[in-house]
Amino acid sequence: MQFNISDIIKTLPHSYPFLLVDRVIECDPGKSIKAIKNVTFNEPFFIGHFPGHPIMPGVLIIESLAQASAICVLGKETIENKVVYLRSIENAKFRKLVTPGDTLILQANIQSVCLGVYKFRCIASVSEEKVAEATISAVLQNK
């Protein structure tokens, strides 16, 4: 299953400048997702991170992975009055810098679901090189 930006906007509660998933290229809802974040020089965070040497903040790479994970939980089905909230981040590692012009590939695989908590193994890559990874837990709750 694929998502265009219109589908993503309907699925996630985020909006500009904090919507960090541009396209979903593969999604098996409740199992796995592969999505894209196109990193452009026009991103507002590049104004201060860092002038003259723009680098995507690691925390926003993790947020991109968390947003992709939320789409994986929800799929294209609109779940009225429900939202996926980030619960925890474990073992986050940042391996390479992400800069303007990069296409960030976001992959998340559900490892387990227990008592409504979804645990994902997440990897972000650029040109098939791992740039970040983390284990992310999230929960589906009422808005």
From Swiss-Prot:
It is an enzyme of class 4 (lyase). One of its GO terms (molecular function) is (3R)-hydroxyacyl-[acyl-carrier-protein] dehydratase activity. The keyword Nucleotidyltransferase does not apply. The active site is at H49. Keywords: Cytoplasm, Lipid A biosynthesis, Lipid biosynthesis, Lipid metabolism, Lyase. Pfam families: FabA. It is found in: Cytoplasm. Its main location: cytoplasm. Its EC number is 4.2.1.59. It catalyses: a (3R)-hydroxyacyl-[ACP] = a (2E)-enoyl-[ACP] + H2O. InterPro entries: FabA_FabZ, FabZ, HotDog_dom_sf. GO terms for cellular component: cytoplasm; membrane. One of its GO terms (biological process) is lipid A biosynthetic process. It comes from the Bacteria. HAMAP family: FabZ. Belongs to the thioester dehydratase family. FabZ subfamily. PANTHER family: 3-HYDROXYACYL-[ACYL-CARRIER-PROTEIN] DEHYDRATASE. Involved in unsaturated fatty acids biosynthesis. Catalyzes the dehydration of short chain beta-hydroxyacyl-ACPs and long chain saturated and unsaturated beta-hydroxyacyl-ACPs. This is 3-hydroxyacyl-[acyl-carrier-protein] dehydratase FabZ. It comes from Wolbachia pipientis wMel. The lineage of its organism: Bacteria, Pseudomonadati, Pseudomonadota, Alphaproteobacteria, Rickettsiales.
